Amino acid sequence: MEMKNTTNDSRSIKEINDTLKKRGHVVTSWNELPQVTMDETGIETSSYRVGLSDNDDAPTVFKLYFPPNCRVEAHTHSCDYSEIIIEGSQKVSGKWLYKGDIRVGLANKGYGPLIAGPEGASILVIFADGNWPAIGIGAGDGSTINASKLLAQFSAAENS
């Protein structure tokens, strides 16, 4: 389930926020949300906040596509989170996860590496709040998580 970039149909986060403020709800799709492709790994991702994007306490949801055999170094996050395998498979800290599997993680507890299966993997990640940026741990140099590129596109809590 590879995500396709549909730049012509994308909606800005400001537009989504304006509609949400005016109507109290908004309907969108992953194809309308801004997307980032990580050059280092080929990972494609989109994100939104549950509620207004400037609310640091709001849950933050990411949809990620990991290309076949993609590897991401061990890391952690400053908030609790949950991951759901939508398609494909992914090895996390030595354990294979498959479509429908759910992994729940606590803040500041490291995991990884992540290795996508031969068919790739589509993952839905729900962070408890805006403190989602990955923090590299161990021997990795941070290049496979490239938090700065994600932060350039997606909002995070101010203290992240």
Q: Where would I find each of the regions flagged by the language model?
A:
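Short intrinsically disordered coil segments
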Residues: 79-81, 138-147
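Glycine- and acidic-residue-biased ligand/ion/polar-headgroup-sensing regions
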Residues: 67-70, 77-92
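A short, N-terminal "cap"/entry segment at the start of jelly-roll beta-barrel domains
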Residues: 1-56, 141, 151-160
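Ligand-binding loop in jelly-roll beta-barrel domains
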Residues: 96-99, 107-137
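Conserved short histidine dyad/triad with adjacent acidic residue
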Residues: 45-51, 57-76, 96, 106-110
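Non-catalytic surface loops within mature trypsin-like serine protease
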Residues: 52, 67-68, 88, 128-130
